[in-house]
């Protein structure tokens, strides 16, 4: 079958038009940051879902929203305020759930609703509603070079961690008590997962928004678990599904 030259020319024109989009810097940054955040969220999401911390992304994103509202009201740099606040919140959730006095889902709901309420109160008293909408629903225009650098660093750390400490993460994810008995420092690896999750949430809020960032953690992992049964296969499939879906 011979393809008509006009058909080839039309296809080439469409390809050129698609590539011309990336001449805009903000679109290129949005694509790179989105793919890297999707990759990080998918890899971390497998462990979080299996450890029954599926809603930690939603909880930390609401904490980040509250921190961003306060930073905007005080005219402070958003990332410099939100990153340490979300990291501390992740450690608090990890500590509360490990004590066993409050279940993990209850702790997430408590912290999430409180932070969201604080953010709403702060916004109502300031004139930063426009900026806050970009954090609630995401905005590709809000991606800066700092976000790009942070997303690259975060993705490299996550990938290296999964490659080097795959067996220990596997043990901590499925049976934390057994991993402690075998000498694995489960607290250290849980802390690392919490730290990386907090960084991923903060960066992802810029492009996905506080209301949708948790979907990058939950949906790819759950979809992969319907297809594969091994931890390695689920992790790889989750990363592919997340990047393609974005």
Task: Annotate each predicted stretch with a short phrase.
Residues 2-39:
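Membrane-interfacial amphipathic/re-entrant helices at transmembrane-helix boundaries
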Residues 213-246:
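Transmembrane alpha-helical segments in multi-pass inner-membrane proteins
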Residues 31-36, 79-84, 109-110, 148-153, ...:
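Hydrophobic alpha-helical transmembrane segments
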Residues 46-128, 224-237:
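Short loop segments and helix-boundary regions at transmembrane helix junctions
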Residues 18-25, 39-50, 67-77, 168-178, ...:
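Short juxtamembrane and helix-loop transition motifs at transmembrane-helix boundaries
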